[in-house]
């Protein structure tokens, strides 16, 4: 590896407990590149599927990792076992509602109906 730095072994834990990896990465790999790796290997059978890297958040040791940071900058060495696998959690950002559908909902007439039943 460049600069004699050891590769970092990482696995990605998805929201349902399944994993992608582990795989080894150069410490100079950016978080954005890791997200591209995850996106390319996202399981097809998942109900929730990210469309872009911006739909993904990576969390390591309780911190949300920034896209422009490298893996070396994002590491939290406390509690890591030398030569062990680092588990990063992957969160999929919910899809943003379409602005046009929001306006339609806001402009639609509200129906006042009682949902109560008196027995």
Curated annotation (Swiss-Prot):
Ranges where the Ubiquitin-like domain occurs: 8-76
GO-annotated cellular components: plasma membrane
Prosegment residue ranges: 117-119
Keyword field: Cell membrane, Lipoprotein, Membrane, Methylation, Prenylation
Modification type Cysteine methyl ester: residues: 116
Superkingdom of the organism of origin: Eukaryota
UniProt cross-references to SUPFAM superfamilies, sorted A to Z: Ubiquitin-like
Chain ranges passing through the membrane: none
InterPro entries: MUB, Ubiquitin-like_dom, Ubiquitin-like_domsf, UBL3-like, UBL3-like_ubiquitin_dom
Localization in the cell: Cell membrane
Lipoprotein listed as a keyword: yes
Lipidation sites (S-geranylgeranyl cysteine): 116
Membrane topology classification: Lipid-anchor
Described function: May serve as docking site to facilitate the association of other proteins to the plasma membrane.
Protein name as it appears in the record: Membrane-anchored ubiquitin-fold protein 3
Name of the encoding gene: MUB3
